[in-house]
Amino acid sequence: MLVMGRKKGESILIGDDIEITIVSLDENSVKIAINAPREVTILRKELYNKIKEENKEAVIKSSEVLKELTLKK
């Protein structure tokens, strides 16, 4: 993991086409702006983890329903 220090208004580049700029800082949070191509998905980690967990649950429920349908024949 790379750890970098940045001040308000400063940026970092990821590859050639993603730029992250520090917009504001306060005691408990950092506000960033992300400039990236539309095809790049950007999610907060907690949202990504929630979606991932919901997808796992959906697969389990779908397989349970499929088993029930198969057994009813």
UniProtKB/Swiss-Prot annotation:
InterPro entries for this protein: CsrA, CsrA_sf
Annotated localization: Cytoplasm
Known role: A translational regulator that binds mRNA to regulate translation initiation and/or mRNA stability. Usually binds in the 5'-UTR at or near the Shine-Dalgarno sequence preventing ribosome-binding, thus repressing translation. Its main target seems to be the major flagellin gene, while its function is anatagonized by FliW.
Name of the molecule in the record: Translational regulator CsrA
Taxon lineage: Bacteria, Bacillati, Bacillota, Clostridia, Eubacteriales
Cellular compartments per GO CC: cytosol
SUBUNIT field: Homodimer; the beta-strands of each monomer intercalate to form a hydrophobic core, while the alpha-helices form wings that extend away from the core.
HAMAP family (UniProt xref): CsrA (MF_00167)
A biological process term (GO) from this entry: bacterial-type flagellum organization
Gene: csrA
A GO molecular-function descriptor: mRNA 5'-UTR binding
